[in-house]
From Swiss-Prot:
GO terms for biological process: glycerophospholipid biosynthetic process; membrane lipid biosynthetic process. NCBIfam families: GG-red-SF. SUPFAM superfamilies: FAD/NAD(P)-binding domain (SSF51905). This is Digeranylgeranylglycerophospholipid reductase 2. Its cofactor is FAD. One of its GO terms (molecular function) is oxidoreductase activity, acting on the CH-CH group of donors, NAD or NADP as acceptor. Binds 1 FAD per subunit. FAD binds at D33, C44, A45, G47, R100, A124, D280, G292, I293. It comes from Methanosphaera stadtmanae (strain ATCC 43021 / DSM 3091 / JCM 11832 / MCB-3).
Length: 393
C-alpha cells in the first residue's frame, strides 16, 4: 500500500497542472497515467490560445509549438469563406498548434519538478472509500498496487471512471458526446498555412471539420459529429470531405487519432467527499468550438490549489472542496453557458441559413474576434438568432 495526500489520475494537461499546483502548495502528490508514454497517442486537434497560456503563467516553448497561428477561416456549406486575420483584427483566441505529445510530457515534467511523484503505465482498476480517504487499486507495470489518498483528483478524460466509481454523476449524455476522428496529413494544400480553417454545415452534422496547420504542407485534418444527427460514422464523413476538398484531396495520412469530445457543458457533480473532477472528465470543453485545452489547464490549477488547502485544513469533505466549484463557475462556467446556447442555435440551422450568415459575416468589419463578438454579430445579422440568443447579452 502506497500512502499519499493527493492522487491525481491521468497525466493530461489538467492532471499535470493539478499535480503541479498541489505539490507547489505543500501536498504530497502522486500522478499516475495508464500510458507507457505521457501524451501519446494524442487525442485532439492541438490548438490552444496564447492568452490562455499566458494567464496561467505557461511560457511558450519552441519544443512543443508546431505552428504560430495568425487567424481563422470559417467556411460555410457553399464555400463562402470568412477570413479573420490577426494582422488586421484583434483575435485574443489566436494561438498555437501544439505538438501534444511533447506538450503533455513537458507539463508532467513541470509537475515532477514541483515535487509530484509520477507513475507511468499505471492503470486504475477500482476505487473504494475508507474512513480516512480513498483507496485506488492500480496495475503498475504488471503488478497490482493499492494507493491510499486523502483526496483523489479525477483527470481521466471523457471516458472517466474515477468520478463514477466515487459515486458522482459525471458521465456525459450520449447526445452530447461528439465522435471525433483526425488524420495528421502531409501534402495538404492550404490557402493560408498560418490560419486554421473550420468547415460547417451538413459536412459535419452537429460539429465541424477542421484543418489545423502544423507545417508548410502538414496539418491535422479532423471532424467532430454528434451521432444522433447522422447515420454515418465520423470516419465516413471525414473521408467524404478529404476526397472532395481541394486542400486535402491529394494529401496522405501519417497518423490517425480517435476519441470523444464532451460538448454538453460542465458537469454539476464535480466534487464529493475526498474527490474533485477536472478537464474533459468534468466537461470543461467549449461546446461552441470543441476546444478544451485551456479550460482543462485552468480547472487543474484550481483543483490543485483547493485540494492542497484541504490537506492543510485536515478537512477533505465536499463542503471544504466547494471553492473549486466557485472558482470554475466564476472563471470558466459563466462563459460556457452562453456558448451552449449558441451551439444549440447553430445546430438548428440548415445549410442555406449558414450560407446567408457567412455572406453577411464576410462583409462585416470586426475590430476584435472571440466567441462573444461572433455571437453578437450572429444576433445582428440573423433575426432568428435575435429571438434565440438576444437575451445572452
Amino acid at each position: 500500500m502506497i500512502e499519499t495526500d493527493i492522487l491525481v489520475v491521468g497525466a493530461g494537461p489538467s492532471g499535470s497542472l493539478a499535480a503541479k499546483e498541489a505539490a507547489l502548495h505543500g501536498a504530497d502528490v502522486i500522478l499516475i497515467d495508464r500510458k507507457s508514454e505521457i501524451g501519446s497517442p494524442k487525442r485532439c486537434a492541438e490548438g490552444v490560445s496564447k492568452d490562455g497560456l499566458a494567464q496561467l503563467g505557461i511560457k511558450p516553448d519552441p519544443r512543443w509549438i508546431a505552428r504560430d497561428l495568425y487567424g481563422v477561416r470559417l467556411v460555410s456549406p457553399n464555400n463562402t469563406s470568412v477570413w479573420m486575420d490577426n494582422n488586421t483584427i484583434k483575435i485574443p483566441e489566436a494561438g498555437y498548434i501544439l505538438e501534444r505529445k511533447v506538450f503533455d510530457k513537458h507539463m508532467a515534467m513541470d509537475a515532477a519538478r514541483a515535487g509530484a511523484k509520477i507513475m507511468i503505465k499505471t492503470n486504475a482498476t477500482s476505487l473504494k472509500r475508507v474512513d480516512d480517504g480513498i483507496i485506488v487499486s492500480t496495475n503498475h507495470m504488471g503488478k497490482d498496487i493499492d494507493i491510499h489518498a486523502k483526496i483523489v483528483i479525477a483527470a481521466d478524460g471523457p471516458e472517466s471512471r474515477i468520478g463514477r466509481w466515487a459515486g458522482l454523476e459525471c458521465n456525459t449524455e450520449f447526445k452530447y458526446m461528439e465522435s471525433c476522428i483526425q488524420f495528421e496529413m502531409a501534402g495538404v494544400n492550404m490557402e493560408n498555412n498560418r490560419d486554421i480553417a473550420l468547415f460547417f454545415g451538413s459536412v459535419a452534422p452537429g460539429g465541424y471539420v477542421w484543418i489545423f496547420p502544423k507545417g508548410d504542407d502538414i496539418a491535422n485534418v479532423g471532424i467532430g459529429v454528434l451521432k444522433n444527427k447522422t447515420n454515418k460514422t465520423a470516419y465516413e464523413h471525414l473521408m467524404e470531405f478529404i476526397k472532395t476538398c481541394p486542400e486535402t484531396k491529394d494529401a496522405q495520412p501519417v497518423e490517425i487519432n480517435v476519441g470523444g469530445d464532451p460538448v454538453g457543458g460542465i458537469i454539476k457533480d464535480r466534487i464529493g467527499d475526498n474527490i474533485l473532477v477536472v478537464g474533459d472528465a468534468a466537461g470543461f470543453v467549449n461546446s461552441l468550438t470543441g476546444g478544451g485545452i485551456n479550460s482543462a489547464l485552468e480547472s487543474g490549477v484550481y483543483a490543485g490549489i483547493v485540494a492542497a488547502q484541504a490537506i492543510k485544513d485536515g478537512d477533505y469533505s465536499k463542503n471544504n472542496l466547494k471553492e473549486y466549484v466557485s472558482l470554475t463557475d466564476e472563471h470558466i462556467g459563466k462563459h460556457y453557458k452562453k456558448y451552449n446556447k449558441a451551439k444549440e442555435y447553430l445546430l438548428s440551422l440548415e445549410d442555406e441559413e449558414l450560407d446567408e450568415i457567412a455572406e453577411e459575416f464576410a462583409k462585416a468589419d470586426f475590430e476584435e474576434v472571440n466567441p462573444r463578438t461572433l455571437i453578437k454579430m450572429l444576433i445582428k445579422v440573423s433575426p432568428k438568432a435575435l429571438v434565440k440568443l438576444g437575451k445572452l447579452f
